[in-house]
């Protein structure tokens, strides 16, 4: 529907999954490695995405000694020695409480659209679980190009009080450039100016541009 409506597509939601730690957590407010790992493996399965296809994980990342250690252990269990960038928007904007998961999704979608890793600020040292030999999970600490030979894919994670885990797999939107022939019909070009003279100048500039360049009139009419 978004493609048909010519909407601006930032990223594609490939799948989501929600579960609860149940009795496997240490306490009501404490997360669980088992629950988070189950959620991660399940969201990858429903999204039909392999662990080696994921390039980034947006962590719940509350910067607590217990929570970060559990999340790091979950990532190590699932991704092993596979390269993976991780980060948390909480370092940039703080904890947005009920909107924390949405903030993760917005940040990650923009990263996919711009094909860029952005830094998690004020990070100095990774969790002990990520320091083990062979672990290739690293925290993003600087802005850098997200290089990939295939579709860029990321996972967003969020944890709720009482043992709730929620994850979403987001994919880069790859536009289908195969298009049909331009329909031979009149197209409406809409523009305005602060005066008649300004409007006339814009009209002349547009006419000159479409004459001198290979322009599809349907595209031009849609964006003007």
Give the role of each language-model region:
Residues 192:
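Short hydrophobic/aromatic beta-strand micro-patches
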Residues 204-224:
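Short, low-complexity connector segments at domain boundaries
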């Amino acid at each position: 529907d978004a493609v048909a409506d010519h909407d601006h597509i930032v990223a594609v939601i490939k799948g989501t999954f929600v579960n609860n730690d149940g009795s496997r957590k240490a306490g009501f407010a404490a997360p669980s490695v088992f629950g988070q790992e189950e959620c991660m493996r399940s969201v990858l399965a429903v999204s039909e995405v392999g662990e080696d296809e994921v390039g980034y994980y947006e962590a719940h990342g509350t910067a607590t000694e217990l929570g970060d250690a559990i999340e790091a252990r979950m990532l190590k269990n699932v991704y092993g020695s596979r390269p993976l960038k991780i980060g948390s928007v909480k370092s940039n904007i703080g904890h947005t409480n009920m909107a924390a998961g949405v903030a993760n999704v917005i940040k990650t979608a923009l990263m996919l659209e711009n094909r860029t890793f952005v830094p998690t600020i004020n990070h100095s040292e990774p969790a002990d679980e990520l320091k083990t030999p062979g672990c290739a999970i690293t925290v993003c600490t600087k802005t850098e190009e997200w290089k990939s030979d295939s579709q860029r894919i990321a996972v967003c994670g969020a944890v709720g009080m009482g043992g709730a885990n929620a994850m979403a797999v987001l994919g880069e939107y790859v536009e289908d450039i195969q298009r049909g022939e331009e329909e031979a019909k009149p197209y409406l070009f809409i523009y305005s100016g602060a005066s008649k003279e300004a409007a006339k100048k814009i009209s002349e500039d547009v006419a000159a541009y479409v004459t001198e360049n290979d322009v599809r009139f349907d595209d031009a009419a849609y964006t003007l």
